[in-house]
Amino acid sequence: MTVATPYFQQGSEIALLNGEYTDVFSLLGMHSVNDGKALVVRCLIPGAISVDVLSAKDGRKVATLEQVNEHGLFAGKMGRRVKSFAYLLRVQYPLCEQLINDPYQFDSLLNPDDVYLFGEGSQLQTYHFQGANWREHHGVKGVHFCVWAPNAKQVAVMGDFNLWDNKRHILRHHPASGLWDIFIAEVEPEQHYKYAISDMHGNQVIKSDPYAVAMQPSPHNASKIPHVERYDWQDSQWLADRASHQPHVQPMSIYEVQLASWRRKGDDSQEYTDYSQLIAELVPYIKEMGFTHLQLMPISEYPFDGSWGYQPVGLFAPTYRFGDANGLRAFIDECHQQGIAVLLDWVPAHFPRDPHGLVRFDGSCLYEHDDPRKGEQPDWDTLIYNYGRAEVRSFLYSNAHYWLDEFHFDGLRLDAVSSMLYLDYSRRADQWIPNKFGGRENLEAISFLQELNARMYQCFPGINMIAEESTAWPGVTQATSNNGLGFGFKWNMGWMNDTLRYISCDPLFRRYHHGELTFSLVYAFTEQFILSLSHDEVVHGKGSLLHKIPGDDWQKFATLRAYYGFMWTHPGKKLLFMGNEFAQRNEWNHNQSLDWHLLTYAPHQGVQDWVRDLNQCYQQYPALYQRDHHSDGFQWLDCNNADNNILVFCRFGMDKQQHVVIVVNMSPQVYYDFRVGVPTAQNYRELLNSDHRHYGGGDVVNDNPCEAQVTPWQGMSHSIVITVPPLGCSIWVPELDEQDQPTQ
């Protein structure tokens, strides 16, 4: 039935129902008409059979609205009332009755300053007003929804709270900013919702909320209303101490973990371990192993398990796989209370093409470039953020801020930075567009990274911003004031590639590859490096680290222990992927748990014990970390002994008296009466030896201290004579007086 009324202008009803009426709040809700002589209320409630207007003050009925058409449009005058008042709608459906606050009576909750900063590209907390946020508005509690869709004709939110009706809650349009918002009272935590967007082409697309803080488990993709309660943090002392922290002169031994496959539970090991179990098992394990940092591979919601989290759709939503957001907070809180810093792998380089995600969000290339030569990433068939667009920068800045602020992460590791820096990254000559100077540098991405790092360090002193950057781009860890990118650390991909290639050679031929062990020291102090043996080195058919090494098991395990000894004593912070600490035999499989049963075998237990002791040694002796990024913290004693596959070097702390001498032998030959130069006339003792029987070695060790002889050697005034273990690493320290012993 349709009632002829003067409540709607001609054509407005059809435009509203067809998703083409942009200024919905000028039509629906309470409005003064007839030059202020009357009040009318208009509403669109599909499925309703009658609607009454009640006074919110006393609950009395003011008017019954007329049904304008069969699509759920109702309208009516408020009797003699001419002054606006707060009201409720009593809606009668065929099987039930509902009392609701009409969302179209509420004004916008958007703050002009927030909107301005968002549009300027400098907003760091966009998540406080976009997405779904609990608010109290004119004494009414509810959820404020806000989304950016500047080219949409109409945006509606639909969900469990309105029976997924895409006409029930159409958002208010703010043309100047491109934002749409609405306040809805009748919403409950964990209800699902999506946005129905009438795009610029007249099509309707259904999208997840880019700022959703929780999402449905895959393969579903609805966003979820957050819980109201806040988490009660217990790490205030940690954060206070972190603010004065100087990470470059502190030990940093990072354990990289993918939570989905570290350890699973259930009879078939297919059930994810939740945060409570990770608190009980992973945190004590990290502490026992002596790692100072935990790095989580991406945990923003991702639909495809095989992406390992590197193709996130819900950038603000911790994945459902391990529990809720407060479970993640509790996990990080416990890490902090146990003295473990937590880093997050963050992916601002690209995003996937999932239709419910950011791709052509409002029918236009909103978050990505419209030209595929700038907007598409050929390696992963993903899309590249438009770093030159202010609102996109605000989105990404805010996401970084969100994880550091809301979850107390101690830093971010940025994935695939090289792909951001170069316009021609993985492209043929005809597949990219030069910058305005004719070069291949992505000036917009460079500016974004510089601003990101500067802002995050300013907001969160003591954090670490880390780049996975695989080229020779200069100044990755230089200050932005010096035209650098402003990162705190950079992964040393060159060291990783060279040394893995070296250990994959048969010892007989390593003499011809000796430079692959030594070349890293040519550039070791040009950046602030992290030596990384990450997940990327044990996937896609590359095999495990153990698998890369030739020879029988004795040679494989001995070489791996020696290699770890070289890594832990080489300048640079450390990162080791899970499973490598006990020499997993198979390459990493994201669909199953690590092979923990291997620890019942002595060689694997020996490698784990070796890594644990390396971490303890590393933290105990400042010479191994204080001058990681300064050339005066390192000295070659012998880097030219290629024929014997031997390296000898010395590490120094701030105090030159604090030093460590390292001998690495990458041949299976034992060297007796081997002379090593030392800086002082003191006795030296063998602190660690990878060939010790405790680690599964042949026990070619130096049990007794060696007296320094006044025999200049290798550029040093004194020397000692030792036995060098086969395929081994031997670490030596001077026997200091008790008061001079290094401390953590």
Swiss-Prot record:
Give start-end of the signal peptide.
none
Catalysed reactions, as listed in the record: Transfers a segment of a (1->4)-alpha-D-glucan chain to a primary hydroxy group in a similar glucan chain
Write down the InterPro entries for this protein, in alphabetical order. A-amylase/branching_C (IPR006048), Branching_enzy (IPR037439), GlgB (IPR006407), GlgB_N (IPR054169), GlgB_N_E_set_prok (IPR044143), Glyco_hydro_13_cat_dom (IPR006047), Glyco_hydro_13_N (IPR004193), Glyco_hydro_b (IPR013780)
GO terms of biological process kind? glycogen biosynthetic process
Q: Which residues form the active site?
A: D415 (nucleophile), E468 (proton donor)
GO MF annotation list = 1,4-alpha-glucan branching enzyme activity; cation binding; hydrolase activity, hydrolyzing O-glycosyl compounds
Question: Which keywords annotate this record?
Answer: Carbohydrate metabolism, Glycogen biosynthesis, Glycogen metabolism, Glycosyltransferase, Transferase
Name a single GO cellular component. cytosol
UniProt-listed Enzyme Commission number(s):
2.4.1.18
Task: Please name the pathway.
Answer: Glycan biosynthesis; glycogen biosynthesis
The chain's disulfide connectivity reads none
Q: HAMAP family given for it?
A: GlgB (MF_00685)
Function comment? Catalyzes the formation of the alpha-1,6-glucosidic linkages in glycogen by scission of a 1,4-alpha-linked oligosaccharide from growing alpha-1,4-glucan chains and the subsequent attachment of the oligosaccharide to the alpha-1,6 position.
Q: Which family does it belong to?
A: Belongs to the glycosyl hydrolase 13 family. GlgB subfamily.
Subunit description: Monomer.
The name this protein carries in UniProt is 1,4-alpha-glucan branching enzyme GlgB
Upper lineage: Bacteria, Pseudomonadati, Pseudomonadota, Gammaproteobacteria, Alteromonadales
